[in-house]
């Protein structure tokens, strides 16, 4: 038997899918232009149409804290289990925690 591959985006079919209404839409400028400050809380909301700066699917929906900036991307500290992880995410995949409603 041949072993099946376990790529970076396995088991993400429903997680990284847009609804038919949103399909083809690029991220809004208001979402791209938001400037986060250190200490701001953000929700990681992956936009599947933007591949650059996309975090792994395990971080989808997690709340993290901005701890810095690297180029256009942000360094976000996320608690995963009992560990503190620092991931690099571009603003297309972030929503501020207060406005996530």
UniProtKB/Swiss-Prot annotation:
Q: Which UniProt keywords apply?
A: Ribonucleoprotein, Ribosomal protein
- Superkingdom per UniProt: Archaea
One GO MF term attached to the UniProt entry: structural constituent of ribosome
Q: Where is this region: Disordered?
A: 1-23
Describe the family membership recorded for this protein in Swiss-Prot or TrEMBL.
Belongs to the eukaryotic ribosomal protein eL21 family.
Q: Which HAMAP family match?
A: Ribosomal_eL21
Specify residue ranges for compositional bias: Basic residues.
1-18
Q: Which InterPro entries match?
A: Ribosomal_eL21, Ribosomal_eL21_arc, Ribosomal_eL21_CS, Ribosomal_eL21_sf, Translation_prot_SH3-like_sf
UniProt keyword Iron-sulfur present: no
Protein name as catalogued: Large ribosomal subunit protein eL21
Lineage of the native species? Archaea, Thermoproteota, Thermoprotei, Sulfolobales, Sulfolobaceae
Example GO biological process: translation
Q: Which GO terms describe its cellular component?
A: ribonucleoprotein complex; ribosome
């Amino acid at each position: 038997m041949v072993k099946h591959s376990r790529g970076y985006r396995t088991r993400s079919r429903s997680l990284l899918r847009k609804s038919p209404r949103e399909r083809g839409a690029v991220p809004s400028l208001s979402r791209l232009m938001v400037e986060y400050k250190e200490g701001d809380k953000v929700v990681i909301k992956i936009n599947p149409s933007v591949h650059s700066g996309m975090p792994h699917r395990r971080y989808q929906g997690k709340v993290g804290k901005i701890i810095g900036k690297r180029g256009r991307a942000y360094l976000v500290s996320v608690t995963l289990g009992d560990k503190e992880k620092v991931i690099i995410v571009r603003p297309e995949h972030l929503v501020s925690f207060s406005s996530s409603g």
